[in-house]
Amino acid sequence: MKRLPLESEYLAPLPAEIDLRLIVTDMDGTLIDGDGRVPVRLDEVVARMREAGIIFAPASGRQLANLRAVLGHVVDDSPLIAESGALAVHGNEEIHSDTISAEEAGAAIATARELASSGYDVGTVVACKRCAYIERSDPAFLAQARLYYAALEIVDDLMTIPLDEVLKVAVFDFDDIENGSSQALAAAVPSVQTAVSGLHWMDMTSPHASKGRALVALQARFGILPEQTAVFGDYLNDLDLYEHADLGFAMSNAHPGIRAAAAFTAPANTEDGVLRMVEELLRRSRRRD
């Protein structure tokens, strides 16, 4: 992709100089383009971040194994926030995790089954720390699950898997989940937190789990302040990232709720918006000895 200069509407609000230590970016709809591809310049730009002493930390609803598979060696030394904040790691070190109870996971599975029986075209993923499980195995649903879960196992009955280490129950609705099955799912398991993470996905996690909470854990682990943190997002499961970063960027393609929460805007994910803005932030970043 040809490098394009940032338009004045993106540049004008930015501080002239920043002390930047941590850049956190969502994946789908944010870093990844409209065809599901990682930016070709990611290795180059992340190398420049590291040379400047800035940590690069992807934060996604995706599974940890999927993040590592999709991003490859570029994140070998990066902290990763996975499963919409329910898990944060750095290498083999677990920095943070939040799980839901076996009873909550079972109720979520049962509710999704009831919705499917009543005509909703939904499928369920039960995400644990090392593997994710599905019981629906038709090609259409399997293709969607495999986009986000590299370590994926098909079972006959989700109720038979160990439910005591569940990070997230994710439900995929082939229709618009925000205006469809999400309300019934949220009402059926009120003790869990629900977040629409895209047009078709809803995540059911611990009420304590969020990308923002995982970000706070990373900041504590590395001694980084909110004013030294930049975040990029596009959808509602990114929302509380903005509470913990002074440099909060909404993609121009973001949900209205994200645009309202963010102090700044970046070009769309289809326009290499994250990397173009990161390069500008690097130019404005205060040099440190």
Please state what every model-predicted region is.
Residues E9-A52, F56:
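N-terminal glycine-/serine-/threonine-rich phosphate-binding loop
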Residues P13-L22, P39, M204-D289:
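Mg2+-dependent phosphoryl-transfer enzymes with acidic/Ser/Thr/Gly-rich catalytic loops
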Residues G29, M49, S84, V169, ...:
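Residue-level signal for inorganic ion chemistry
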Residues V38-F141:
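Active-site phosphate-binding/coordination module
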Residues L42, L67-L71, S181, L185, ...:
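Hydrophobic packing residues within well-ordered alpha-helices of enzyme cores
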Residues E51-A57, D76-S78, K168, E227-T229, ...:
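Short active-site oxyanion
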Residues H73-D76, E83-S84, A188-P190, H244-A245, ...:
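Short, structured coil segments at secondary-structure junctions
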Residues G119-F232, L236-L241:
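Conserved acidic, metal-coordinating active-site core of Asp-based
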